[in-house]
Amino acid sequence: MIKIGAHMKISKGFTKVPPDTANIGGNTFQIFTSSPRVWKVNPPKENDVEGFKNAMTEFNINFEDVLVHSSYLINLASPKDDIREKSITAMIEEIKATDQLGILHYNFHPGSHLGEGEEFGINKILEGLDIIFKEVQNTKVTILLENVAQKGSNIGYSMEQLGRIINKSPWKERLGITYDTCHGFDSNYDIRKKEEVQRLLDEIDKYIGLNKLKMIHLNDSKYDVGAAKDRHEFIGKGYIGREGFKTFLSFDEISKLPLILETPGDDPEHSQDIKVVKEIFKELGKL
């Protein structure tokens, strides 16, 4: 069974997300818990939580298959103490909101060291995660590190880097990863080629463990492999292309996972992208 959906707006309330997902042909989704551009996190209201959970059941969406994405402001690797402190506080509140909604996975970008060096950044991420987990250890939420584009001082563009963070953490059992196809393509994982998809899976298995690969951000790229631009494109319309995604999704280790679109546009465009992905699954004999 295909698990496919998109990043959905919460502006109409959490309760509307499951029906809106079904309307575009999806059965999974990603949301923010609050505005991603401010530090303040507003916890969901009790009636919103109840309505959301009822809608999830009504539209047969599995809580394990959906994802909360962190605020854009968060940077656990920052050399600035105030930014790290704000990031830690925001993540704690967002994870508590995730747990309230019954969602089991929370996704964040590891961060940028801003010139202080990779080792500095990784140590700060580990310190931050330790503080966060001590505050949210009674929740059921797994924190997923997302691979990022290999640009600037970003941390987490390679599976080896993500593995170093996860394996050094005392909270390893509560950590996993989301793989973003555009970010990976930016970082020279050329998933248009079978041998490159196999290399990716081998690296995940070696450095992290394939069991920790929980979600896929399915995005085409406006730029060619290794460009490090982080510009998402509609499925099949970018440099990865329809055939590239067919190669990528031919691997059962990937096609069995929830596939979340972060492509441009809104519900109509996401509906079209979902149709394209379903067509690819049919061509592969998986639907």
Curated annotation (Swiss-Prot):
**Species of the source:** Petrotoga mobilis (strain DSM 10674 / SJ95)
Is this entry keyworded Signal?
no
Q: Which cofactors, if any, are listed as required?
A: Zn(2+)
Matching PANTHER family, A to Z? APURINIC-APYRIMIDINIC ENDONUCLEASE, ENDONUCLEASE IV ENDODEOXYRIBONUCLEASE IV
* Residue numbers binding Zn(2+) 1: 69, 109, 146
Q: What is this protein called?
A: Probable endonuclease 4
Q: Which PROSITE patterns match?
A: AP_NUCLEASE_F2_1 (PS00729), AP_NUCLEASE_F2_2 (PS00730), AP_NUCLEASE_F2_3 (PS00731), AP_NUCLEASE_F2_4 (PS51432)
Q: What keywords does the record list, in alphabetical order?
A: DNA damage, DNA repair, Endonuclease, Hydrolase, Metal-binding, Nuclease, Zinc
Please name the gene that encodes this protein.
nfo
Q: What is its EC number?
A: 3.1.21.2
Q: Where does Zn(2+) 3 bind?
A: 183, 230, 232
